[in-house]
């Protein structure tokens, strides 16, 4: 549109208007759209000014569309304005161009939406969802960048989830190392197509290296008995944890650190306890029972519940040995034989008491048995000496011989009054045994820690399954079946194996006497409980699968009945027969199978009886519905036969034939009525048909009477012909009789007409009822009196 166009021969006002229009166009071309629109709006409206305004708005909207800073939502709005203008003024702007702009912007909006969703999925590392959005984006853009993004996401989406904690700590770490190495390779391959995956690949590679180093240090802690080596390994693990805080393995490394700290702490405890036990053995070798007991007690306290039974027995036995008494010292002056006899009697008493104590100690810790035997032997020798001295005391020797004898006895006393001299070898043997027991204790603790870790893994899975079951709401039967199946699989694959592995370890520790059998029995009971739960969940999954199958068939039957409209009686009969067959063959068997399974679970106490009773009630409902449908199939079959008989009435040749056909139809209707009554259908659809057939029978019967009334009289008249013509009197009589017969026949015909009219009225009423009922669906639900409502062609539904 030219900015200097002036039409010829115009008035002054028109010229002014044209000048203003040209000015507005000029302003629009300069980009001052608001001022241009202000000028046009002040002019009188006309086709010319409206087209100029449309031109200005098109220019304005096109400039706004070119501005990428304009929000996309506003740009789409401007494009829609262009479409509206182009449709009204196609000479100003092409409608097709306007539509193309709208389509382009909608595509841009779709791309933006997909990019936002893609970025959200990538930020959450949901690569499967991101792959879906990338494929949709590629379908629109189909450029190298989107093609490469799809390829990269296909690679990373194929990376499986990390392994779940199961088995030993070392086997789990080995699995993690392999996983992160493989994942790093996959992300490295993906980064060839999309560079954003390179940092992820590097992170995964670093994680794999740290996990490998972590595994090395954990193995060092598990295999060493050196405190310094274990502490060095722990320090390395702490460094790994600090370095991995920004990595995805941070939670795992922290958990491993906690376990490693406990293991090293136990190694330190075992080492300190071992030092106390060595000190105890040394004190025992020196005959210092009190010192030996104190050190052994400190070792036992350090080991706590993990202390080997042999160390506990050793400590308890030493507690008894501390009660032994030193033998009395020899008298400094011996005045006579009585002094010696008194001394050795006191020695015997001390030996006897010590023998009792050492015997008791050896019953607790058999390694102390040689000490008790030594005291027994020494007591025996001392008793012999006391007997000898008693005899000498009764008949003392001469003074010189007496002193010589006492001198020999004192020499013997000086050699035999220190019991430790003849049990030193026994003490050394005890020390060796205790050192071995301490080494075994460290090993046993590692095994116990591993068993506890396995049990924690199993318990974590069990908690996960419990949460999954508790949070499952509003599920379909099929979803419930899958829920139980998933729960059983999870328990069988992730909870049962670590619990069984822990059981093997604890069983071995119990054989070594490191733990009591109760702990083993408890884990064995847990295994049995898990196995029972798996069996119950599998059974429940199967039961709900059967219920889902039955419910699907019932839904299918309900849909079939819902969609059954405008059917003939024969089709209604076949519909009920097919529905009954389907329920009997496809819904009832799986429901019965589910009932058997649930009944067995109820006997075991796994579920309550209410669930079983509900399924049993459902089975009864299905069986009742099958019986009812079979009755209705037969009933509508009879109804169909009855109406087929009535159809024959249009071709009857005599009233008597009509009576026969109507009676046959009534017979079928009566049989149908009995079946409807057995099916508890109220109102009975056969009742009107019976009434209709009855009226037809009565009508044809009246017609037959009319025919039989006229026929004889007409025969008389027909027979009054030459050669025996009737007299006038006879002929008058015949016609009078015929007239009377016609009058009687007319009454019969009137009655017949009345019966046929009633039959027709019933037929019309039933036709209207049937048409109304064919537009409805009657559900098989009991009313308050327990009767079921049924239209003539109404499809009966079931609900289980």
UniProtKB/Swiss-Prot annotation:
This is Structural protein ORF800. Residues 759-800 are annotated as: Disordered. It is found in: Virion. Disulfide bonds: none annotated. GO terms for cellular component: virion component. Residues 785-800 have a biased composition (Basic and acidic residues). It comes from the Viruses. Keywords: Coiled coil, Virion. The lineage of its organism: Viruses, Viruses incertae sedis, Bicaudaviridae, Bicaudavirus. Residues 761-776 have a biased composition (Acidic residues). Residues 98-130, 447-475, 514-567, 606-633 form a coiled coil. The keyword Protein biosynthesis does not apply. It comes from Acidianus two-tailed virus. The keyword Transmembrane helix does not apply.
